[in-house]
Amino acid sequence: MALMSNKTAIESILGNFEKKHVDAIYNAAAQTILSHSEFRNKHFAYSLNSYQKKIASKVGIELYPNGYLPHSHPLSKIFENHLLFDVLPGVVNTSRLVMCSIKESKVLVFKGIRDKSRRQVSDLNALNSLNNSHTSFINRLVASKDVSRYTEEADAFFQSKKGSPELFSRNFIKSLENKEAVFFHDEVHHWTKAQMFSFLKSTKVKRFIFTVVYPPEILKKFANSQNPKVYDFKVDKGRLFFFPDGVKTEAYEQKLNMEWLFSASHLRSGDCVWTVTRHKSIYAHHLFEISIGELVTDSKLFFSDYNSIDMSKIFLDRFRSYEVFPISIEHLYKVYSYLLCLKKPDLESGLAKLRQIIGDDVEIKEFLFFEQFCKRLIERQTSWGLFGHSFFEKLTDMALSSLPNSIARIFPQWKKKNTFEFLFSLGTLVVDVERKVCFEHVLEEWGFEVVITDENAYLDPLSIFAINENFNEDRVDDGYLERIRLPFWNLNDYDLKRKRVNAYNILSYRFEEERKIESAQKGPNKMLQIEWYGIKEFKVDPFISNSITEFTLLEALLGKRIDPKKYSYSKQACTLSNYLTFLCAEGLDGFNLEEHLERRLKAAGHDVSDDEEEELTSAEQAGPIKILADPLGFMKECLEEIPIETEPSLEERGQFSTDYHSEKFEINYNDIFNPHNCMNTHGDEIPTPSDGNCFFSAFTETFEVERPDTLRSDFSDWLMEFNGGSYASLAEMIRPNGVFMEAELIYLFCVFRGVTLIIHDRTHEKENVYAVHRGFEEGHMVHRGNHFVGIETYNISTLTSDPLLGDIPCGFSEEITKFHFRPDHFNCAQFRGRKAAFITKVDADYGHNGMVYPHNSWVPSLEEIIQICGQGDDFNCALINFYEANSSLGFHRDNERVYNDDPILTVCTFGEGRFTIEFKDQVTSFLMTAGSFFLMPKGFQKKARHSVSNEMSRVSITFRKHVRRLNGSPIAIREENYKNTCLINAFSKAMKRSKQAIIAKLKTVNSPFWSRYLSEGNGGSIEDCQSACEALDVTVDLNVNGKCVVLGKGALRISMALRNNHFSVINAAQLMERTFVSHLLEKGNVNVLEGFDAMLSGDVGAAGVNKIQFAANFEFARILANSFLNMTTGICLGKALDNGEKYFLHILKDRVKQIGIDVTMVCGFAGSGKSRKLQSWLHSRKKGNFCVVSPRTNLAADWAFKLELEPNEQRKVSTFEKFIKTDKSKLDLIVIDELTLFPNGYLDLLVYELADVNRHCQIILLFDPLQARYHNKMDESILTFEHDVDRLIGGQNIEYIYSTHRMSRYFNRFFDVPCFNQADRTEEQRLWIFDDVYSIPSICSDRQEPCDVLLVESDLEKKAFSPIINVMTFGESQGLTFNHVCILLSESSAASNEFRWMVALTRARTRFSLCSTFLGGIEEFKVKRKESLITSILQGEKITFNRLNLMLKCNLIRREKENGCRDEVDREERLEGDPFLKPFIFLGQRVEKDEDEVEEVKIREPTCQTHLYITEPNFGLCYNFDFIREKEQREYREDMLVTNQFCDSYDKVHINGKRETPGPLRFKAIYPKHSADDDMTFWMAVRKRLVFREEEENYQRLSRAHLVGGLLYTNFKKKMGLEFTFDQGLLEESINAFEKKKLEKSCGTIKSHSIRSDIDWALNDVFLFMKSQLCTKYEKQFVDAKAGQTLACFQHLILVQFAPWCRYLETQIRNQLPEEIYIHSNKNFDDLNAWVKKFFQRDICVESDYEAFDASQDEYILSFEIHLMKDAHFPQKIIDAYIDLKCKLGCKLGHFSIMRFTGEFCTFLFNTLANMAFTMCRYEWRRGQPIAFAGDDMCALNNLAVCHDFDDLFELISLKAKVERTETPMFCGWRLTPYGIVKEPELVYNRFQVAIEEGKVLECLENYAIEVSYAYSLSERLYEVLKSERQVQYHQAVVRFIVTHIDKLKTKVRDLFLEQSSDEDI
């Protein structure tokens, strides 16, 4: 986080350059600024406030630094100068410029700028020619102020005719006539539109450039300024009064209506057209240009120089403008977000926040608005949101929207909805103006009614929302202002009725004009002046369509593309009538109207014969009259005459685009060979003969041509007549057969045919695609060298009018064919006619119809294909299909649950196939060839199905985005969202590697396992820790419940603990018994059994592991074998069809009746992780000989996915039938998963086979004995013997894992099993019970928890409810996992056994619900079930472990797994009162460090008694009488201010206080007291302790100080012997220590300081105040008034950012300091006492004190700190932020110089370091010489010699030391002696007396007793220290006082004073 500023890469590296290089870099900038300074000083040096500076800089104006020129409206003046002198010279590129309405002085400045700029880019000859610049100026008198502005020459152009409508005199027009460029300054806003046209037509200037002043918000009907600090205005009766900078006395009056100018893209008068260009807009100042000709210009203008909310969202009354005070959007967002952050928001907090934001810019209207806004927000909140509505809420919303607001506002839902819509639709004000052609002959009026808002708009803003239609723009106001029956008046209006009337008025006006024309034949051509730009606004309104001449509208729509000789007016009118009737009948909107009309006209029209010419003429003459007389009848007549479906002839198609208008045709070279992005799919090239006619042959293959043999001659004939025969020469040239077609001829041919030709140029290796002409039909051909060939082209055409399927993105790229994929590259699934490989780069799986695809890792080439297609890069999975020839895939939808309705990309890399799409009842197909692709967009799968058929082999890739796994669990969880990763965190800290690096390594070893581990967020077990050890190659000593388990086998050994479900790192394992887990097996070893038993039996895997001897029964095996052969069990081992007998040869012969075998069982609760450790073990031993046998295909696929088996290793996972067929002779291990689902006798059958082929194979059985046993209707009467599981566990004690990773805490209300799933569920969430199955999907969906499956007991129920919801039987669901299941309570389930119910109750992760269809209801169901699991749940009883144990014939021994999944939330709770600090404190799991306590041996020194003399009573008062002076003499006075530091009375009464002395002689009067209300003391502190300087000077001084700072640090580092290496662990500990320290405060304290966390508190702004204190230092006794101590309060973010780094630095330095260097902190007096005893040398000591120590820590000390930080490996961004903070720091008093502040982060550390650096330079210090440091205090216990090596340095730095050499040194208020430290007894005595006066003895007794104890413990040796009688007196008095209050002491110091006998005892 950048604290003060963000730096670019170059700015960041500048700090590493040498000073000369930095100076050289900045020298260029200095020269540039110098070159600009003279000009900027004259025109941009006006004095601006900070806001105005910000505004000017934001719009890109270069200001003169520190402007000083006063001006009445400086900002507007700067805007004007910027347009004139910065922008205008770049716009005018001609020297022939005439400037008008501008002072001569400004013209001269403008000419100077232009001459200077041209001089820089011209040579000498050009320079000479510039001397003849033709820039001139002409002024005329228009306004009264012009008389004083311009010279008397302007009078010559004054229009003196009274009442003349012309604004310009003849002389003036003549002087500007035919000029190349004319510029008007700030005059055009006085003109009308008519005057603008008059000027343009009269002068005929080529370029008319002008500035205008006009507030853009008027265009959006705002009647007052939305930038009141920049400008203001007032609207009054069609006049606009503009106030620059809001200054009313400088007002300008001008015309209100300038809408015609801003909304005009072109000006048109007859055949003359001008283009309007807006060059620049700066708030209300604009620069426009009008140039001759019809050029491309902006279709819209945008004005966004606003920071207020768009109040038009509120005031939606039609046809009115409102006076609205601008409400800052920034203020609104900040107040709104602040209130949301508060747990208990209140009105006062919101308004206080607003007051803090706006500072001194208080506006009462804004306060009134926010007062009501905050009230409404607090009272009603904004519960109405975007998502999560129930069906009922949606209905309520629709009803409220349709009600009048007067009724709707009664409902509380409306008010919440209203607030939400206001906030949701809120945006910054942007004025956008739609531009169109402005006609001269169309008169304009602009409706503008101002509605002055009253106080209600601010007292109750929501009532204004109510009046203004609740933002529902579909509702129409019935009232509107008087219509102005003139065209182009507000054509696009809110009101539909008014819009129709306006449109009708325009048409009526045009028809009246048409009737005046004498020649009716010219009528339609004349009507072309209407043009499409006006007609298109009518939107084909039926109101208009019945009132307009149809063929006239058609011509206006299609422009000049209609050939009147080809299409009769009757046909045109009929075509239009038919289509308009169709539009009205269907209720369509007329989208792409002109294209549809062209297509229909093309179908209806035909060549005009000689006989028809008469009809044509008569129609031309009578048509308009007839149609106007009876338009509907004429339409009907035309409709009967000509069928609209008539297909056009060849000639009609070929000549459709012929232009017969008077305008001359010119070849548009911009329309020839334009680069084109072809999105069609192409097949093979179509060869053409190389006979010179290849173009025509290819054209014939591309387009349907009826007479291809005459194509060349028809084209030649057309050229002869086209454009008046101007292309006759080309016609003769192209007529001969074999003449090659070239560029212009190809273009003309496309014009002739009216087509668009797409040419694929494949002459070179890279294909280029070009488009020629824009016609009605598109075709493709290939150009290779000088030869044209055809090409097969396929386009996914529009299926229906449905917009979803209208245009499916598709394309083709040759690069795709370069990618080659083969089935043997991947682990494929086999289907009929195809193989498919599923590839993913996330933890995803995929399957359908009961099968699961094998897993393949992502390959980089797929990313390249995605990039080539360019259809998005959000795909994370791909399915590669390898189709065989003549294969197909039927109609289907890609709508599996693993993904949402996201786009799906299909790419064909090899071969070709036909893709068919079925939508509703329509079917369309297209061919996909190699290199083609298309995208099925979002929503496609819901509306359409698709199929594929292939005649030849083909490779297709389908890219998708998977969001969840097949079981419903989410995937693609972002790393920062991982939960319960204390195991990962522990490895990260122990190995000193980042968490990301640990995760990356784990995923490379076993991606499925660790991806699922992180996604589920259920924490880690001991087995997971072991897997991590093997993956990371480390050895972990894991401390678990007092035992130490050794995991892994690696060179690196670390110690961890698992306590309270939390993994943490410990320094070293304690001495305890260790259990070693075998690591005999290296990764990759083929012997899968080596170390396996040790893994199972060790402490890591012991939970749930049982060793049991199983007695296999031959009879049971034989029965099952016969059942397989008879196909009553299984389907693929039949005797007849499958030759199954060969697999049971070992059973057919006689065998012993029983065989005993030792098996290993792992038993555990559902989701307990029974298979997890085995999967981890086998994953690293995939080369071993093992096989996992699963009862179902989907379970087997899950094993294969987690083991990441290669294609040739798939045999290692098998279903139970396939496993019977496999060879078992080489297997070392067989894992049977979910044994309860295997048929009875399967284990017997397997044991007898192994007895023959492999006696050494080990069998592992995984099952939950509480789950249902195998059941099959076909063999239930055959396999009647007891199931293998029950025979195994019968009468045994079974270790059972009683915990679950599957189920959430929701299930703890039903079971007492520990649930490790961290889903957001609680036990309190109620059980849902539904009354019928039909309501389950809708209710669950509304509750945001859709039901995944309905579990039923019988197949009959499954069939009945399958159409409604996904249904499974209890048995089918066994082994599967869902998020939410619903269990059906019915007659069938009431008869089900407890094991099957256990299956149903344990299938869900987050919730199960119930649905009752039982006849009689829930109560009868409970009676039927009696005592059962489901009955307990219905009665609210928790199912206990003991209750489950009773279900079995064995004894389950409960074992719970330790799991690390504890997250801490106490930090968040502690920060509840400071929401702004919360984001900056780590709220996750803390690093818990256990440190071994080392008990130190304490040496007890001998104590001896001493005699203390009894002092005289009140002896202290005698001394005070001599030393205390009058208060008047001690206080400081300046002018009328005087300090108040010394008390001389008992003016303040203290509880329990005593008055033992007169007021002037009070002990409190000994010391100066600083109070916050003492202004003079504060100003003394400011003068003494603070230095102010501008930040620029601070930076300059710092840049010059680095040499001295470097010397200081180099010397310091050398003498201290410091060497730094970065320690990440120490940094994390420092961060944690800081946060813990911060949060040790109470919640109340944190909340009371929350204002310091306010995000709006500027980081470089401190709150400065004076510390209130009684200065009870020994040296402050009896002194005069002293300056106060200033404190600086910093923003909390500063502390959060820097404090941990300072802790880190302090620890690093302390660890390296020699023991003779002591830093005293944290009031640890024992350490100081021990250090003094050890190093005191009875020598002369050196003490140093500093003058203004804080203020003296200037840029040199800062440079020293920077060098230290860099050497300590601080990040550069931290150093840069620290520099910025020190240089930019300020408060309300101004900017500070670089200095230290009390209250700054780590003030003590940096003070101490500065003190040490100074001392090391000042004195000749050698190793072994003891020195104590503490902030600005220093005491050396040797007589150090002064060093003169740095004398020059000391002349530069501000630090000045006061040195004292003494034999009785003082340090931090302690006297240092050979026997330790002693506190000055006089100081303690006086403090006690002050406490007695104020009644605070008990508050300080303990601390003072501790201070005195050091002297008291010296006994008789004290007399060597206290050498004066006065000191002994004070000491005796203090000790006696403590002894008399000894019963009040609580700490161990009490024992010291009790050991001594009193005088009375002797």
UniProtKB/Swiss-Prot annotation:
Q: Which GO terms describe its molecular function?
A: ATP binding; ATP hydrolysis activity; cysteine-type peptidase activity; dioxygenase activity; metal ion binding; mRNA methyltransferase activity; RNA binding; RNA helicase activity
Keyword Hydrolase carried by entry: yes
Q: What Pfam family does this protein match (any one)?
A: Peptidase_C23
Catalytic activity as recorded in UniProt = RNA(n) + a ribonucleoside 5'-triphosphate = RNA(n+1) + diphosphate; ATP + H2O = ADP + phosphate + H(+)
Give residue ranges for domain Peptidase C23: 978-1067
Which part of the chain is the (+)RNA virus helicase ATP-binding domain?
A: 1122-1297
**Residue span, (+)RNA virus helicase C-terminal domain:** 1298-1445
Q: Under which EC number(s) is this enzyme classified?
A: 2.1.1.-, 1.14.11.-, 3.4.22.-, 2.7.7.48
Q: Name one GO biological process term.
A: viral RNA genome replication
Q: Which residues are 2-oxoglutarate-binding?
A: 954
Describe its function.
Answer: RNA replication polyprotein: RNA-directed RNA polymerase involved in viral RNA replication. Protease: Thiol protease that cleaves the polyprotein.
Name listed for the protein in its UniProt record: RNA replication polyprotein
- Which organism was this protein described from? Citrus leaf blotch virus (isolate Nagami kumquat/France/SRA-153/1984) (CLBV)
